[in-house]
Structures are given as C-alpha cells and as structure tokens.
Amino acid sequence: MKKSLPLLNDQQMKSFIQDGYIKLAPDYPPELHEKIYREIEQMLSKNGNLGNNILPLIPDIQTIFDHPLVRGALTGVLGVNYVMHSHRFCHFNVPGSVGQDFHKDSYEGDISANNHRCRWAMAFYYPQNTPKEIGPTAILPGSQYYETSQAAHQHNELVLSGEPGTITIIHYDLWHRAMANLSLSNRYMLKFLFYRLQEPTVPTWQNEDTKWHPTTHEKIYNSDQQIMYRSLWSWNLGDSSPQSTIDTRYDTSELVKKLSADSEEERLRSAYTLGAIGDKVIPELIDLLESKSIGAYATLALGSSNPTVVPKLISALKHSSDLVRARIASALGDLGDYSALEHLLLALGDTAPRVRRNATESLGNISLKHGNQSLIEKQATNLGKILLDEHYWIRDNAARSLAKMGAQAEPAVVPLTCALSDENRYVRFNAALALKRIGTPKAQDILFDHLFTSRWCPMTTSDSPY
C-alpha cells in the first residue's frame, strides 16, 4: 500500500458501503479546471464528442485522477491495484434539457453483471461550477444493492452539486440520473470507470477497528441491511469467514420463504441471513437456484457464506440446468476458495455461454497464493484459449482475469497478442493490460509495438495534419 496517500478512515469506508458514494474536492488551482472546460468546448465544437478518446485529447484530465486524495479514495474502495478502464465519456447537459430517469449503467465490454461487492466504481468529475439549476447528477444513496426501480426509489434523492473540480466516486451499481438543466450554461460531467485487480486480503484504508458498527451519520436512505453491510465490510477486510458472529437460531424455513417476499428489501435481508447461517441451508439454497425469481437471492446467500460450503457447490456444477451451473460458478468466485479452481477450469468448456462467462470471471477472483504452479499454468493456458470464444463478453472477462493474474499469466502471451486485434475495443484494452502486468521482456516488446502503432496523436487534426 502507498503509505503517502491520504487513505479513507473507517467511518468513510463504512459510509461508502452503506451509501455507495464518496465526494471529494482535490486542491487543484481553478485554472486547471478552466483549461479542461475550454478544451472540452473546443472538442465538441470541432469534432463532436470523442468518447473514450477524451483522455488522450485532454491529458490534463489524468492529472485530476492522479491527485493523492482521489487515489487514496479509489485505493480504499477498489484496492491497491485498481485500474482506470478504457471507457470514459463526457456527459453534455445542454440548457433546457429535461434530465433523465434514474438508472443503473451497463458494464462496458460485458453483459449486465451487477456486484454487491465493490469490484467496479465510477467517478464523476465537474470542470465547472455545478449548482442544482445547471443540471448536475443526482443519486439515490444506498440504492446500489437493489435491482428494481421501486426498491431504489425508497431511497431519497441526493443532488451532487459542487464547485469546479468536484469528484464523486460511486459504487458502479448505484442508481443515478442527470437532472434538468434550467440554466443558460452547458454542464459537463466526465464519467470514468475503474475496477479492482485483486480481491481484498487486507484493509486498503486506514483501518483501526475491524468490527462492523452502523455509521453514526444521519441516514439519507430508507433501508437497514446490517447483516449485508457486515458481510461486505468483512469482505473488504479480507476476512474469508466473515459470519462467525451470526445468531444461528433463525427460523431457516421462514427465511427461505422470505426469498420470494414482495419487498426486495426483505428478500435481500433474508438472502444474507441465510448466507451467514451457512452449511445447514446449502442444499435447500441449491435447489432454489433454478428459479428465475428466487435463484438470484439464493446465489447471493451462497456467495456470502463461507468456504466450508464449497464442496457442496462443486458437486452442483454438474447440474442439468445451465442456469444453476452459471449461478454456482458465480458463487464459487465470490467464495474465492482455490479448491474450486480445477472445477471452474472444466466449466470453461461448458456448452452454455453464461456458464463459461461466470467461470471465466470467477477464475480471476480466486487468489493465486495457493502456490500450485502447475494449476496456475493450466489456469493461464485455459483462459488464453477462451480468448477465442465467439462471445465478446466472455473474451473480455478472460482478458480481464488474465490481467488479474499478473506475471502468472505468462503462458497466455500468444493468445493475448492476438487479442490486441480483437473486434471489441475493451477486449483489446484488457489484453494490453494483461501484457503490461505479465511484465516479461517479450510481453513488454509486444505491448510497446502495439501501442506505438495504435497511438492517437491529440495534436494532429485536419487543421494540422503533420
């Protein structure tokens, strides 16, 4: 961990787990934000919105995200080895706009795969003063764990107004929207994505108390999910058996019934309570995985349990239903026990795309500290083969999982080199990242040759072609 960074404290981290956001004010001079604002206006007037290429066009934006305050906050919520994703966008809110409805963003390069555990985050940056009337972003704090609009709207709207340079980091699945612009000025908000490269093993914030205590600040949301919050807090601490303090005297049959309750809040609370209870409810939870309505909550329960349940889940990877196999593969990734590795490697050959996708992602979430070099080489080799899958969202997960393996992904250098020419831009990005993290002279040469060939020069325009 970079000790020089101003890290989040326990209270800030707990607030992020509950609320799903943290607001920052890096101390850059106003002139920097004014310069970025002018260059955004110039981009839009001359070239339109260049989307992902806004960063090489306006490299000062990188300076904003390199601020120690921002890096410290991202380190807290995403771990030391977080990475900036290659998707970014300038959201342009024009005068007179009516705003948006609340929504969750899709995952770039992947199918929708919401995570309660913070593996992805977004950052919103304002280069201009952004009062309410200019149409800032609004969020529903605490809504990141809810899938239905009805449940999300039980939470109160918070307007993210702010001075030039304001940055808000949010959990990727937080419900948010652009508000109506009632002013005569343009409002720009730059959205950048980040994701973690390593599951937590130790706290990456300034941790002093490992016990979960509800935050003391005034609640601005209307739900209370202390068992879920404690589970997520324990995961961020790197605790592999986070539920040792749960009261096991719950009526499990009643909890199972509540997985189909009308209230999403009740379904969620029951799922995490069942996960905390663990072993004795696992067979019943596995039986529920085939249900489209209840299965997602059973998956949450299984994934938030403890490694002692892994053998039962491994057996269920042979279930006749591909939906069950996919959900089991996902839960095994959340549990993170390396005894599941060989079985997840076999699941890469499943005929069902969603099983292959979940197995591919889960392989990137399981620690390599087991030290079985033969198994690590097999993992890298098989993930390299999946880079040829017909579905881009499986290839994207394969490249990202190889990037998470770091130097251990060296056996996949050849397929990663081919993936630099993939038809999907995000597969290309993750393949390049994987080569960077492999770090051998061969991987570095391949990467630099690719980057020099594909380099986009921000100084070259139709007015100045050479």
Regions found by a protein language model. Give the residues of each.
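Non-heme Fe(II)-dependent double-stranded beta-helix
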Residues: 1-113
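Alpha-helix N-cap/helix-start positions at coil->helix boundaries
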Residues: 264-265, 279, 291-296, 307, ...
